[in-house]
Each structure stands twice: as C-alpha cells, then as structure tokens.
Amino acid sequence: MKKMKFLVSQLYMLALLVLPFISSSCSDDDDPKVEITLGIEDGATVNVGQIIQLEAQINNTNTQGEIEYNWEVNGESVSNESNYTFMANEKGTYTITLNIINNNDNFQKSISINAQMYPSSFYVVNEGKYGTPGSVNRYQKGEWNYKIISELGNTSTVGVVNGNYIYIVSKDSPFLVKAELSNYSIVDKIEDGLGDNGQGNNFCIINDQTGILTTTNGAFKVNLNPLTLGEKLNDMDNVKNDKEDIYKTENYLFIRSQETVKVYNINDLSFNKQIGTEIKTGFALTKDGMLWAANSNKLVKSNPNSLESEEIQLPNNLKIFIDTTYKPSGLCASITENALYFAHAPNFNGTDIYKFDITTQNVNKFFTAPTNYSGYGAGIQVNPQNGDVYLIYTENGWGAHYLNTYIYVVDGVTGTQKAIIDYTGEYWFPSTITFQ
C-alpha cells in the first residue's frame, strides 16, 4: 500500500513538472507569429493622383476561418475589403493602417506614404476665356508659374519650342509670337498679312531660317530672323476657311488642307502631290516610320517615302474626336510601342482614350475618362522623354464648369494612372501641352 501511494505521488510530481512545457508548446502553436505586408514599402513616395493598389498579404498558413479587414487612412476607416485602392488628393504624409480580425485575434499593420506633386516640366498653351488673349503657363517641379507669356492673340492654339525660343500661334492677331525661354519676354510677332478673316492654326519649324504658319487662308512661309511673314505656299491660292494641321518628315512637309493632304518637298517647299484620301485631323509618326491621320471612324496611314496611303476602318463604332472649329490634333503616337492613342467621341466630345496596336490592328480601351468629364483642346499629348501620356479633362457643362480642369498623367504602355495635376480655378481653356 505504501508503495502504491509512493508511485502515485511520484506520478503527480512528474505531471506538475511536465505541465508547463505542454502549456508552453500549446501557447506557441495557438499564437503564431503573423507577418502582414501591404504591397508597398513603408515610407514610399507616390505622386498626387497616382493609383496605388494595396493588398493584404498574411504570411501565416495557420490563419483559418473568416478574416475581417478594416483599412484606415490617417485614422479614418475607408474600406473593409482585402484590397484597397489608395490615391492621395494632395501632397503630404499619409498613415495607412490595416486591421485584421481572425478567430478573435487582432493583428495590425501600419505604413506611411509620402505624396508629392508629379515631378515633371512642361508648358500649357491656353486659348483664353471667351475672346480674350491666350497665355502660357509653366509647370515645373510640382509648382505652377502662371501667365509667363500673356500678350498673345485671342484663342491661342499651339506652342513650338525651337532652341532658346518658343513660337506661339493664336487664331487672332498677333498670329505668331516669338518669346525667349530664358525670361519669357516677347521678342517679335506677326500681326497681319493673313488675308480677309485669316486666323492662325499651327506652326512648323523647317530649318534655322524658315518656318511654316498654317492658317484658315492657307499656309505661309515665315522668316525666323527677323520674324516676318513670307509668301503663301503653292497650291494654296484659293484656300478659305480652312483648318490646317502640319507635320515635317525628312523629305516632305505634310499639310492637312481642305480635308486632304498636300505634300511639299522639304528642300525647296515646292508642291509635290495631293493625297486624295479624306482627312479631318493629323498627324502622328509611329515607330515603324508611318505617318498617320484620321477621319472620324477611319485611320489613314501614309508612307512618308513613297507617299502611298491606305485607310483602316475602326471597329465597334469607335469615332475619333474631331472638333468643328480648329484645335490641334489629339491623334498621338507612342514612343515605346508601335501604337496610336486617340479619344473616342460617342457624342460631341472626346471621352475615353483608346490605343491602336499597329502590328495587330487591335483597338483596346487605354484609359477611362473620369465621370462627367470630357477632353479639352488637343486632349492628348505624349511626353517625348519617357512616353507618359498627358490627358486634359474638363468638367462637362458650361460657365463655371470650365473652372474644373485637370491634367491626368498615365503610363504610356499600361494606361495606369500616375498622377493628377490640378489645373482648376481659372478659365484657362487649355489647348495643348508643350514639352521642352
């Protein structure tokens, strides 16, 4: 009997010694280390208006059952999904916190994101408000410098940078203004000579001495030094009420005139031929060396060497935006792919942006217009330095709606939104973006 009591006593003592280890082992299994990542590094820098996709990644296979999510931005709850799309509306530091509940356990992960203004540099040529002079604004290092050039004609259309100067075209006098980029002072201008009711359209530099000014009354030679209007190009004598785009290649000058294309030899600006295909906007030179224009639901491809052309019908009732009054063309070419960008115009305004793959001839939506907004001016420009696509959108409506204008910057390959640049607060009516 004593032996039995002794054995029970020993087993009891052994159980007391082993129990802490068993308890500790179970505790370790029930409370595993949970690692949470959000798909972006803590302290990352993004652009204002950049779309950031955050995804809850729980690096622990022991989490079972229902998982509840709660995303917070600067302490405010914003989503209960496993993924969250973040966009900074203004520059500053944002604290993003993800709270997770699983089997009554709570886990949390917080990171900081720094939002900056998009670090780009470009000029915007503004039409001006309701018959008032146009102007040029500059965006640089996240800051706007307004009306750096302002003594322009009414309804300015384009700005062409050449060396240390920028040439700005306006529909009304002065039709062409030459300004220094170093201090933005106007050094010369062309104020007359376009004929009855003549208006400026566009401008092209031919060489160090000569440019071409396209107008409603035909295309004129321009002497650059000093800035003076020369003679009208051949085969332009009877042109009236025209809308003229222009593009220079190595051997030829292409001018959209009277809804066709007139081709001039670049060496002496003599008339070469007319391409009879109907054209309503142009031009864009793609990576395969072809020159493109458009006519509503058709793209027109021209070989800039042989001058042969062909039409390509767009599918799915797509229509390229073409304004009834002259605006610079929004048909643009990618610098990284053999592709074109254009704004689809289901009604009267350009909205969503489409991308035409020249190799496959497939057309896909590239960027969806913001709700209740439409493109303005040329609407599309491609940054020649990095291939980003810049889109100008203005709120639909009249009057004060035009105060709400934004410039969207998207990746030229994927269409991913990289930034939104605020262009509100004034009746700018932006016509084009010009890169230096």
Regions found by a protein language model. Name each.
Residues 69-87:
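Surface-exposed, flexible coil segments in extracellular/virion-facing regions
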Residues 142-152, 185-194, 228-237, 269-275, ...:
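A short beta-strand motif characteristic of beta-propeller blades
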Residues 1-8, 14-51, 103-122:
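Bacterial Sec-dependent N-terminal signal peptides
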Residues 153-163, 196-208, 238-250, 277-289, ...:
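Repeated scaffold domains used in trafficking and secretory/extracellular systems
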